Amino acid sequence: MGQKVNPIGLRLGINRNWESRWFPKFETMPANVAEDDKIRKYVKKELYYAGIAQTVVERTAKKVRVTVVAARPGIIIGKKGADVEKLKDALSKLVGKEIAVNIKEERKPQISAQLSAENVAQQLERRVAFRRAMKRVMQNALKGGAKGIKVSVSGRLGGAEMARTEWYLEGRVPLHTLRARIDYGFAEAHTTYGCIGIKVWIFKGEVLAKGIPTEKAEETTSKPKRRPAKKRGK
């Protein structure tokens, strides 16, 4: 089951938080979901080259707060924050509500699955060989501190007449382990031969029940001392 299901959805409430954080009435829920989808699609389309890793939408009774996590926040902010105000006005006009926009920097873009998938897609659109693009992203992720990474590409690879799927795996990616912090990303590359889909899974380590990474837990727990062996009498 872990091989088939989306690893983010499988771990919601365990070691992953929701990207839409609000509690509406039943009647307003469909409209809120549609608004969230509009906001995310607009941000992804207009700010694609800023490297959008995540878009979190939080709601109160009257306000909507959008937090954009980007690898290159300077592109979004602009000179003296002028572009942020434009984005804020555009989103407010799109949704018809007052919107507050926060910009956060993705400090480790190498181990963001979404950014890695988009990186492969951009390379394929520049006609880089798909195996080289996959290997390059995998090397960067492992250098950035990932414990394991799996990259899958599917479509008319290399311009072949028949579509196929190829994937590479480095390190460990335990999809069935719920305490494992696994990030997942998907992107599409629009090439002259058609559309190629890219999926990326990145394993960032395991988390215990208290939210402590297993590496730190092993350091803090002291090893039990061995008792000295008893001397046998002659």
Curated annotation (Swiss-Prot):
Biased composition (Basic residues): 223-234
Keyword Ribosomal protein: yes
Pfam families: KH_2, Ribosomal_S3_C
GO biological process, alphabetically ordered: translation
HAMAP family cross-referenced by the UniProt entry: Ribosomal_uS3_B (MF_01309_B)
Function: Binds the lower part of the 30S subunit head. Binds mRNA in the 70S ribosome, positioning it for translation.
Protein's name according to its UniProt entry: Small ribosomal subunit protein uS3
Higher taxonomy: Bacteria, Pseudomonadati, Campylobacterota, Epsilonproteobacteria, Campylobacterales
